[in-house]
Amino acid sequence: MPSLTALASLLALVPSALAGWNVNSKQNIAVYWGQNSANSQSTQQRLSFYCNDANINVIDIAFLNGITPPMTNFANAGDRCTPFSDNPWLLQCPEIEADIKTCQANGKTILLSLGGDSYTQGGWSSTGAAQSAADQVWAMFGPVQSGSSVHRPFGSAVVDGFDFDFEATTNNLAAFGAQLKSRTNAAGGKKYYFSAAPQCFFPDAAVGALINAVPMDWIQIQFYNNPCGVSGFTPGTSTQNNYNYQTWENWAKTSPNPNVKLLVGIPAGPGAGRGYVSGSQLTSVFQYSKGFSTFAGAMMWDMSQLYQNTGFETQVVNALR
């Protein structure tokens, strides 16, 4: 009979339906849900539909696309939500509330993604305003606070952390992130995760200051839509002139969390972004990336594209092995 230590080491290498984010694995898969970029009523199912997928560890709910004031957008999933009476841009979503709890019961790590390309508020005029906004976000999506009257889009459901996917300059974003981090650290109980989704160009203009100031658990880099993406990878050589994972590895070692992990972000289908590559091409990309201690798996945009692209998920899983 194998020892418990040996068994634990083996399980750390094997994706499981009962496992969310695994810091010791190089086979994590994170997928964004909520924007239905495939753009058909049938291409985005309710959140819980995807939580039976044993290959997916992390689901990023996209997006809280406004913060001051708060705004949500979940594409067709929002059709089953109800606007709050005093803020028609903020949705109350009992179905998503129930589904978050179902997904967490299935072992999935559920993050709320902040920003997105439709975020246009530009941030905050002062550090204090950014900190107040972070307190509000924590009250809305963290543990229910006794006596609080804040609107909670997901009711009593509590997310497992926050993803920062800002695509444009956001004033005082680092102060916002630091305050939100302090709230999660002080909460006790379960671990709350922080991730960010910069574009592959380094440094990233939108979240660069944030990730240089606030410790992240992982960075899910958008290696698409740019020459530094996976489509620029050259097989058979350790010197990459375009695909710049090495640059991000170097940054990670001096970041606020020197143990931060990196996910290679890819389009989940040909319509998800420029620079889509097939699963067979990804094998060489991932084999190269596995040579770095920071590598922890893949991120895909988005769930609707993934489920339309028959067989691609299996190809990604196999490429990560």
UniProtKB/Swiss-Prot annotation:
<dbReference type="GO" id="GO:0008843">
    <property type="term" value="F:endochitinase activity"/>
</dbReference>
<dbReference type="Pfam" id="PF00704">
    <property type="entry name" value="Glyco_hydro_18"/>
</dbReference>
<dbReference type="InterPro" id="IPR045321">
    <property type="entry name" value="Cts1-like"/>
</dbReference>
<dbReference type="InterPro" id="IPR050542">
    <property type="entry name" value="Glycosyl_Hydrlase18_Chitinase"/>
</dbReference>
<keyword id="KW-0624">Polysaccharide degradation</keyword>
<dbReference type="InterPro" id="IPR001223">
    <property type="entry name" value="Glyco_hydro18_cat"/>
</dbReference>
<feature type="signal peptide">
    <location>
        <begin position="1"/>
        <end position="19"/>
    </location>
</feature>
<keyword id="KW-0147">Chitin-binding</keyword>
<dbReference type="InterPro" id="IPR001579">
    <property type="entry name" value="Glyco_hydro_18_chit_AS"/>
</dbReference>
<feature type="domain" description="GH18">
    <location>
        <begin position="27"/>
        <end position="321"/>
    </location>
</feature>
<comment type="subunit">
    <text>Monomer.</text>
</comment>
<dbReference type="GO" id="GO:0006032">
    <property type="term" value="P:chitin catabolic process"/>
</dbReference>
<keyword id="KW-0378">Hydrolase</keyword>
<dbReference type="GO" id="GO:0005576">
    <property type="term" value="C:extracellular region"/>
</dbReference>
<keyword id="KW-0964">Secreted</keyword>
<keyword id="KW-0146">Chitin degradation</keyword>
<dbReference type="GO" id="GO:0000272">
    <property type="term" value="P:polysaccharide catabolic process"/>
</dbReference>
<comment type="similarity">
    <text>Belongs to the glycosyl hydrolase 18 family. Chitinase class III subfamily.</text>
</comment>
<keyword id="KW-0326">Glycosidase</keyword>
<keyword id="KW-0119">Carbohydrate metabolism</keyword>
<keyword id="KW-0732">Signal</keyword>
<comment type="function">
    <text>Secreted chitinase involved in the degradation of chitin, a component of the cell walls of fungi and exoskeletal elements of some animals (including worms and arthropods). Plays a morphogenetic role during apical growth, cell division and differentiation (cell wall morphogenesis). May be involved in the degradation and further assimilation of phytopathogenic fungi, namely mycoparasitism, the major mechanism accounting for the antagonistic activity against phytopathogenic fungi displayed by Trichoderma.</text>
</comment>
<dbReference type="GO" id="GO:0008061">
    <property type="term" value="F:chitin binding"/>
</dbReference>
<feature type="active site" description="Proton donor">
    <location>
        <position position="167"/>
    </location>
</feature>
<protein>
    <recommendedName>
        <fullName>Endochitinase 33</fullName>
        <ecNumber>3.2.1.14</ecNumber>
    </recommendedName>
</protein>
<dbReference type="InterPro" id="IPR017853">
    <property type="entry name" value="Glycoside_hydrolase_SF"/>
</dbReference>
<keyword id="KW-0843">Virulence</keyword>
